[in-house]
Amino acid sequence: QCLVGSEMCIRDRNSKSRKKCEEHPGEVQKRPKSIPADIVRFKNGTEDWIAFVGLQDGRPYEIFTGKIEEDAMYIPPKINKGFIIKVREENGSKRYDFQYIDRYGYTNTIGGISRLFNEEFWNYAKLISGVLRHGMPITNVVSLIESLHLNSETINTWKLGVERALKQYISDGTKTKDKCPSCGQETMAYQNGCLTCMSCGYSKCG
């Protein structure tokens, strides 16, 4: 269920766990040193990519993405949650580490995930994170990303991966103003991260 504006929404994600998220448009919440994060894996062309989605109050607060380099950033495929830790260096610069618990209960830390990612993708991710931190509704963030017209095919493919990652956090039943391409009715709503027509059942994911 979800209310418009500053809201609390609760949805059943993957029919296993319930996710609660609060949206505060225009309000920037202070970032704790460590915040919980989800891992979303996706394809960028033929390459395997990964997204770290940092969460505040259950909603996306920041997102970092890049190509999976197993020799530099191996994370077991079954690991889909962890923590993003903000570390301030002695010289005043900052970095972000990712921390997770392995199957044996040991804490594993990958230091400086920002250095592992292509700078161009990192900068786009920082831009998107800035919008998320200001509490823009996820549907609006997705629409903003969709409206970006980028020259590089690789970046456009990456953009689609980010859209898919964020759509997972849109509450089931959230309506849009889109017309169904199948029946023409304005009855499109999100279900399990996919746009679904409530009239004819047409569905589009990704």
Specify the residue positions occupied by each region the protein language model found:
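Single conserved hydrophobic/aromatic residue that forms the stacking wall/gate
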Residues: 1-5, 10
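Short glycine/serine/threonine-biased micro-segments
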Residues: 3, 133, 199
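Structural motif
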Residues: 7, 61-62, 139
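A glycine-rich phosphate-binding loop feature that marks nucleotide/adenosyl-phosphate handling sites
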Residues: 11-23, 144-150, 163-164, 179-185, ...
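Non-catalytic terminal/interface segments that mediate subunit docking, oligomerization
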Residues: 21-118, 180-206
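Phosphate-backbone binding interfaces of nucleic-acid-interacting proteins
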Residues: 90-171
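Flanking scaffold residues of small Cys/His-coordinated metal-binding clusters
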Residues: 174-175, 192
